[in-house]
């Protein structure tokens, strides 16, 4: 059970993966799924759903003293990954000194109710755990009762046909204060589910497995058996998380911060773009969740101005040395590039840029020189006629689940000259009034002085990694020459 280096530093599975041999000796039920290999080690066949289910039950029993029923035909949670998720949430709670009366909402708790059970047992949190499937709610109720945690966890059935995810739960508890919400949404759209999974004939209807012949891609490392509702939702996970974002816009700080797991990296871009449209009114972060050979992400955001979204997992930094005084030169260059900076600490700057000004410097200098050149000496280019009309409008501030609220329109017209084409292009992207556009890149820069030189360390706060590398290379070329 290989673990990733990006697991939380407080996760015990990071440095000490489960010992299958010790577990097999202690738990006879788990022993049935183990086998010895030639080097004397004990292995587990992860391609068997029953073996993975038994491993999860055994780890919950040994490490958390939880007796959990995981019925066949439903998703089997991976304990290291779920603990990782809870630890990241705990980091945010600790960073904001929220250590008592912590109440969370687990959206789509499933039959295992694992988020709530681990959160309540390991961290002492209280939970409202919701699910739209009546059978899942019943099994989750039984798991909570079996572990005598009814005082800490309330399992609630919600109407799956209702588009809102959080509104009904919050409105039914007007006097309650919620610290966070968490969610593991269905990853796939229906077409993806039909491509990746087939019906499992040995179980009930609407149960699917990824254990079938693969022609176009390699077989999965472990078997996944799940109900239809656990696998797909209309619009996939992007649409589902957008529904949570919609509710968060209305609820604001009724929930201090919002989180969700993301299963597909391609889903991050549209969701981050959606959050960026709220400008400086929202803070958000993304952190990886590693478990074995599977990678997931946690997306967290908040509308509360006093909240910080810090975790124990730090972004990697890039460093270089430059002649003294590095801090003074750095501030001058950031300002010259049109960026803004502020001192977080005496030797730490936070810099942000709202446009890319550090690339194509030679072309920029040449263009500026042409502007001030004598018009009589300027090169004469072939005549062309270009018309451009730009209108920046204010929308109603409400985003749709898709891009249907925006439009881009382009039309071409023939002219009397057969070699020329006249083109008209229009674009409209509604921007909520009063919203300040978010910078395209934000960096934290630490200056460590030495006797002869200064060391500058750059850490990406938000934006694209390529912008971080471009800025660092530009400043290195400039400050070190």
Curated annotation (Swiss-Prot):
Taxonomic superkingdom: Eukaryota
Annotated localization: Nucleus
Record-level Gene Ontology MF annotations: mRNA m(6)A methyltransferase activity; U6 snRNA (adenine-(43)-N(6))-methyltransferase activity
Keywords: Cell cycle, Cell division, Meiosis, Methyltransferase, Mitosis, Nucleus, S-adenosyl-L-methionine, Transferase
Known EC number: 2.1.1.346, 2.1.1.348
Sequence intervals crossing the membrane: none
Residues noted as binding S-adenosyl-L-methionine in the record, renumbered to the chain: 82, 108, 131, 164, 184
InterPro entries according to UniProt: METTL16/PsiM (IPR017182), METTL16/RlmF (IPR010286), SAM-dependent_MTases_sf (IPR029063)
Reactions the enzyme catalyzes: an adenosine in mRNA + S-adenosyl-L-methionine = an N(6)-methyladenosine in mRNA + S-adenosyl-L-homocysteine + H(+); adenosine in U6 snRNA + S-adenosyl-L-methionine = N(6)-methyladenosine in U6 snRNA + S-adenosyl-L-homocysteine + H(+)
GO terms, biological process: cell division; meiotic cell cycle; rRNA base methylation
Cell cycle keyword on record: yes
GO cellular component, one term: nucleus
Gene3D superfamilies xref list: Vaccinia Virus protein VP39
Oligomeric and partner information: Self-associates. Interacts with dlc-1; the interaction is direct, and is required for nuclear localization of mett-10.
Family named by the database record: Belongs to the methyltransferase superfamily. METTL16/RlmF family.
PANTHER family in the cross-refs: RNA N6-ADENOSINE-METHYLTRANSFERASE METTL16, SAM-DEPENDENT METHYLTRANSFERASE
Function according to Swiss-Prot or TrEMBL: RNA N6-methyltransferase that methylates adenosine residues at the N(6) position of a subset of RNAs and is involved in S-adenosyl-L-methionine homeostasis by regulating splicing of S-adenosylmethionine synthase transcripts (sams-3, sams-4 and sams-5). Able to N6-methylate a subset of mRNAs containing the 5'UACAGAAAC-3' nonamer sequence.
Protein name: U6 small nuclear RNA (adenine-(43)-N(6))-methyltransferase
Organism: Caenorhabditis briggsae
Chain's gene name: mett-10
């Amino acid at each position: 059970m290989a673990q990733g280096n990006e697991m939380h530093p407080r996760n015990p599975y990071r440095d000490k993966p489960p010992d299958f041999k010790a577990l097999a000796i202690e738990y006879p039920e788990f022993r049935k799924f183990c086998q010895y290999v030639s080097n004397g080690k004990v292995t587990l066949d992860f391609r068997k759903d029953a073996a993975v289910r038994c491993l999860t039950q055994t780890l919950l029993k040994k490490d958390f003293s939880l007796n959990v029923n995981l019925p066949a035909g439903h998703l089997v949670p991976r304990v290291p990954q779920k603990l990782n998720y809870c630890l990241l949430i705990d980091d945010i709670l600790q960073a904001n000194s929220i250590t008592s009366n912590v109440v969370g909402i687990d959206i789509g708790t499933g039959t295992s109710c694992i988020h709530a059970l681990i959160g309540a047992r390991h961290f002492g949190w209280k939970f409202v755990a919701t699910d739209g499937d009546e059978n899942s709610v019943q099994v989750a109720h039984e798991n909570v009762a079996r572990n005598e945690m009814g005082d800490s966890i309330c399992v609630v059935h919600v109407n799956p046909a209702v588009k809102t995810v959080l509104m009904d739960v919050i409105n039914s508890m007007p006097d309650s204060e919620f610290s966070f919400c968490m969610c593991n949404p269905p990853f796939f759209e229906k077409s993806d589910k039909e491509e990746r999974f087939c019906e499992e004939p040995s179980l009930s209807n609407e149960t699917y497995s990824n254990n079938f012949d693969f022609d176009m891609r390699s077989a999965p490392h472990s078997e996944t058996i799940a109900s239809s509702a656990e696998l797909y939702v209309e619009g996939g996970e992007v649409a589902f998380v957008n529904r949570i974002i919609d509710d968060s816009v209305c609820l604001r700080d009724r929930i201090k911060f919002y989180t969700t797991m993301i299963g597909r990296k391609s889903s991050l871009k549209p969701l981050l773009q959606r959050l960026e449209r709220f400008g400086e009114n929202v803070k958000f972060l993304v952190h990886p969740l590693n478990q074995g050979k599977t990678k997931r992400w946690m997306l967290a955001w908040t509308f509360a101005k006093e909240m910080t979204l810090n975790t124990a997992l730090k972004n990697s930094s890039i460093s270089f040395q430059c002649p003294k005084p590095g801090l003074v030169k750095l501030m001058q260059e950031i300002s010259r590039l049109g960026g803004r900076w502020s001192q977080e600490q005496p030797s730490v700057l936070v810099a942000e840029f709202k446009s890319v000004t550090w690339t194509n410097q030679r072309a920029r200098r040449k263009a500026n020189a042409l502007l001030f050149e004598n018009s009589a000496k300027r090169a004469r280019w072939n005549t062309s006629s270009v018309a451009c009309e730009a209108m920046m409008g204010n929308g109603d501030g409400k985003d749709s689940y898709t891009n249907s609220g925006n439009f881009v329109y382009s039309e071409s017209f023939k002219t009397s000259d057969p070699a020329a084409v006249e083109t008209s292009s229009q674009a409209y992207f509604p921007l909520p009034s009063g919203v300040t556009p978010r910078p395209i890149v934000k960096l934290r820069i630490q200056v460590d002085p030495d006797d002869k030189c200064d060391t500058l360390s750059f850490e990406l706060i938000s934006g694209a990694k390529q912008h971080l590398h471009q800025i660092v290379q530009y400043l290195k070329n400039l400050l070190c020459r």
